Structure formats: C-alpha cells, structure tokens
Design a protein with these regions (language model features):
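Short, well-ordered beta-strand segments in beta-rich or mixed alpha/beta enzyme
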Residues: 10-16, 45-77
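Short, surface-exposed ligand-recognition loops at beta-strand->loop->(often short) alpha-helix junctions
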Residues: 16-27
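Residue-level signal for secondary-structure boundary sites
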Residues: 21-23, 67-69, 105
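Basic/polar N-terminal segments that are highly enriched at the extreme N-terminus
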Residues: 1-6, 110-111
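Acidic/histidine-enriched, glycine/proline-rich intrinsically disordered or flexible terminal extensions
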Residues: 100-111
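A generic structural micro-feature
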Residues: 5-7, 51-53, 91
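Short acidic/polar alpha-helix capping motifs at helix-coil junctions
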Residues: 8-11, 22
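An amphipathic, aromatic/His-enriched active-site/gating alpha helix that lines ligand/cofactor pockets
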Residues: 4, 31-43, 62-99
Length: 111
C-alpha cells in the first residue's frame, strides 16, 4: 500500500458575497472551485461564515510542497485565478491568497 504524502503547505483563499447570494455562491464555488482542487490537492476544505449583511467563504487546500501547489496554481502560487462568475458574486475580488507552512498537525493529517 502506498502511503499518501503529508501536507506541508496550506493555501488559503478568502472571498465575501452579499448574504442573500451566499447559498447560490456556495454551490457555484463547490462545483467550479472545490471539485477541481479535489483532483490535485491532498485535501481541500470549504468554510463559510454568515454575518448580518455578508458571508465570507474560505477555501483551504493542502499540498505536499510548493512545487506540487505550483503545478496546479502556476508559477506564482499566490496569484488568484478567478472563477468565471466571481466578479458577479464577490463584493471585492481578492488580490491574492495566503500560503502558510504547516508546522504542526493533529487529527486530519497528523498522528
């Protein structure tokens, strides 16, 4: 049995939509943003926080290393490739993503 690689990198994207469009965007984001990541990343999470007037979405993808992430995201992995309808949904188009090195993990990936 081949052991699955352990992620060392988390790539975090954030975007906000008007609260009344959050359910529609959640479905769109899953279909067009999360599903492609499922095929390439070691794991991916879609998170949502509903507030009074807006909803924030956070997508976290987990990667074995920067090279693996760059094969998916391109030469500059901080650069965002906006989805076709992001401009329609998002209050403001994010300018970049956050890339963090995983220094400890328990449960999902850790021992």
């Amino acid at each position: 049995m081949t052991e699955r690689p352990t992620p060392t990198i988390a790539r975090i994207w954030r975007g906000r939509v008007q609260r009344e469009r959050a359910d529609e965007y959640a479905a769109y984001l899953y279909e067009h943003g999360i599903k492609p990541l499922e095929e390439k990343a070691l794991a991916v999470q879609q998170l949502r926080e509903d507030r009074d007037t807006d909803s924030e979405f956070v997508t976290i993808s987990y990667w074995e290393n920067i090279e693996a992430m760059s094969r998916f995201a391109g030469k500059d992995p901080r650069r965002i490739h906006h989805l076709a309808r992001d401009e329609e949904f998002l209050i403001e188009l994010p300018k970049g993503v956050q890339i963090l090195r995983i220094t400890a993990s328990k449960g999902l990936f850790g021992a």
